[in-house]
Swiss-Prot record:
This is Cerebral cavernous malformations 2 protein-like. It comes from the Eukaryota. Residues 161-193, 214-290 are annotated as: Disordered. One of its GO terms (biological process) is negative regulation of homotypic cell-cell adhesion. Gene3D superfamilies: Pleckstrin-homology domain (PH domain)/Phosphotyrosine-binding domain (PTB). Residues 184-193, 237-251 have a biased composition (Basic and acidic residues). Signal peptide: none annotated. Residues 214-223 have a biased composition (Gly residues). The gene is Ccm2l. Belongs to the CCM2 family.
Amino acid sequence: MEYEAKKGKKGFVSPIRRLVFPKAARQAAFRSSVSRRPLHSMPLYPPDYLIDPHILLCDYLEKEVKFLGHLTWVTSSLNPSSRDELLQLLDTARQLKELPLKTTPEQDSILSLSARCLLLTWRDNEELILRIPTHEIAAASYLQDDALHLLVLKTGLGVDPVPAGMDGSPGGSGRDPGPPGAAPEKRRVGTAERRHTICSLDWRVAWGGGAGAEARAAGGGGSLERQRAGARASGSWERRQTFSGSWERRHAGGGAGKPGGSWERRQASGGVGGSWERRHPGPNPLDPQNHSPDAYCNLVILAVANRDAAEESCALICQVFQIIYGDQSIECVDRAGYHYRSTPKRPWLSSCTMAPRTHLKRATVAHPHRLSTAPTAAVSTTAAGPSSSYRITWSRCGVSWVLLRSSSLHCCYETIVWGCLSRTTVQVCRNSMGTDGSSFSLECGPSSQIRTSATSRASWRVWVSARAESSLTALAASSAA
């Protein structure tokens, strides 16, 4: 009985305790007791904040930010580089109570970047907030509003919020965080890796096993919020509404009888599916050249520590974009107004400025070695001729050759990022090496190899054997003398 009486007084706090220890201090003490894991990150250096593209292709990078809100009613004609437009939009969102007036530690989140997508998760329980596919990114801009350093991401309509605590992705926790005083469960190993290997649409399809498939069979399709219309989801303003997503879904007049969704779904008379271009051969109202007021995009508002952190995040997002669209740039290509996406042309970077600035260490091999490179290797070799020798170095920035005084033979291997070679530099090297009759060919691609013809190999063996015989003759003559 005594235990039951004490249990009933659990929520009581004495007035003296309230005066001496305010609520904010008690919450800070509780937050400090929850340990946070170190981020999966690496140091990057200004002004370019360059990173090895293979890290973004095969791995991911995490940055700590504050998630302020996700606006879904923004027109696609918004200029993300205009400070006045962004400030006016942020003030309107604050008046509508869709953005907070100040930042709190509860807004701490993790921005995880990879070549496939951008992930936003809460810092403490690491529940998934947003998944933004790379092809949906339109622009990333930095904005300073009073003391806040804001990172604004303009994305397309293919971004759906995920209710907190209901992450059912194959690698998400999918569990209830429990009462506030309970200790959080240990994070599963490899969660972020599995989240980065699937896109947003694939995740929603993969999640639909068991209860999800039954819900869709009962007629509840769409995102998770629309399937769970009766439950109240915590988190941002959009996740607390009955219907999340674009502005039309939440403000479509006519109630449940009128289908919400994008402009194409509301304007489709025959009720057939598919994109707008297949049903209407005329001009596209989502074209930025002649856009329609009904075309909308999403804005993700993040707060960072300082200007350097914002510039680093913008640079990383630009590099993520250029990995997929190597011949285009995120600043001049706005994809938020399109429902269709162009096919990635090159999965590798085409600019030499994207290479990591790494100090190269050379290893000299004393014996001849057959030269072959992997996608992440570059080779430097010295080809000796009858009268002189040339050193040809091919790397990510091209091919260069220099005249050497001594006719030595050695091979040097350097581990840097592979890149394509220009035909001009290859032709110059071929012409310069044509003095002794040798020939070679270079090919650009992930499976590139450096091959020498049979004629050049035969002449090279003859020259090496003659050089060895002359060395032995000179050695014998010197010993005899």
